[in-house]
């Protein structure tokens, strides 16, 4: 929260994954986008809290990869609710900007599977059409299980997603963006190594690759 507050005067839009729904009141004036992670998307309190947001919110598919669970989460967040939040009875009107985020999946044996390919996106388009959801949209998380945490693969995956937008009008209409993990220095480090600008969690693209990839995305949107 301190980092978010200190950057509030900048022109950079800020996004955060919401781990704890009860903390929303502390950061709601600082964020322009909220993601609900794969391990939280099935939690009812996360779904209900998002229904009261006035910013775009992305629901990631669960680690199982189940599209129906993900879309049911979007359905819940897009509709109004009465529920107890931080000790108060509250009413929400629903968040029409709730959408899905595809982040790949993990099998019961621990193997990763991808869900950014053409056939996955077409299947998602069809499932969206079958449900009573407004503003059907998807963001593709190109790291996590989609890359198997091989962070350099993000570059290739982004190009594939952008190509699929070019060859299918349905995919182009639905896929609004990609989610990339990047930082100043590429890769990651263990806590205590103290390399400035290097991730201590998931491995990330470095500054140069991130910059070049943004230019590639811009070119492929033309």
Regions from the PLM with identified roles:
Residues 1-9, 13:
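Single conserved hydrophobic/aromatic residue that forms the stacking wall/gate
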Residues 6, 50-51, 90-94, 170-172:
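Solvent-exposed alpha-helices and their adjacent loops that cap or buttress functional pockets
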Residues 7, 31-57, 79-83:
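Acidic, His- and aromatic-enriched active-site or binding-groove loops in soluble protein domains
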Residues 10, 18-26:
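N-terminal active-site wall of soluble small-molecule enzyme domains
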Residues 11, 27, 126, 130, ...:
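Catalytic-site microenvironment of enzymes
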Residues 14-18, 57-61, 180:
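General beta-strand structural signal in soluble alpha/beta enzymes
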Residues 52, 59, 64-159, 163:
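Conserved mixed alpha/beta catalytic, RNA-binding, or beta-rich assembly cores of soluble enzyme
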Residues 105, 109, 133, 139-200, ...:
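Catalytic-face loop-and-helix region of soluble metabolic enzyme cores
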